[in-house]
Amino acid sequence: TPLGVAAAQTLMARLFPENPPRLVILREGLTAPAHLSGHMILLPAAALDQTDGPDVVAGYVLAEQLRAQADSATAKLLSYAGLIATVRLLASGSLSATAVEGYAETFLAQAPLPVSNDDLIAAFKAADVSASPYAFALDPTGQSVVALIEKDPFLGGSPRPVLDDGAWVSLQGICTD
């Protein structure tokens, strides 16, 4: 929906004011956050459906952006495709559909790489977002994410809203037609 797309853009501009990545919400096929080349963050629609507010979604996005900075999606694709396919890509400008389809299956089955708590806390602090809602979304007991909770730079809540209520509702409805 247009309002959902606008809300996604607002969220990304709020989290990354200087160079916001594009946020794409996928209704099917994705079970965990991911990133693609071209400065794109992917979230499963369930990440929006199973949370009470935008602070959790902000956490998923911040964590995935850290993964994107540490890990090139293009390099992974070319590594999967192999040397011959990579040389063909350089010579012809295209990659075989077989290589892309095979990598897509592998890509969708991968679990997200871990992100260091210190890097996450720094990202939350830079974005003015509380880390605790994200931490409790990962582990409702808080036991495995106690470091995120204890080091939360905004333990009482984000100092400014991640999204207003209208934008949050629009973002949640992004996949409805």
Regions inferred by a protein language model and the residue ranges of each:
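Soluble catalytic domains of enzymes that build or remodel membrane lipids, polysaccharides, and related
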Residues: 32, 55, 62-114
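Metalloprotease/metallohydrolase-associated module, dominated by Zn2+-dependent proteases
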Residues: 88-177
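Peri-catalytic and regulatory segments of divalent metal-dependent proteins
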Residues: 1-75, 81, 174-176
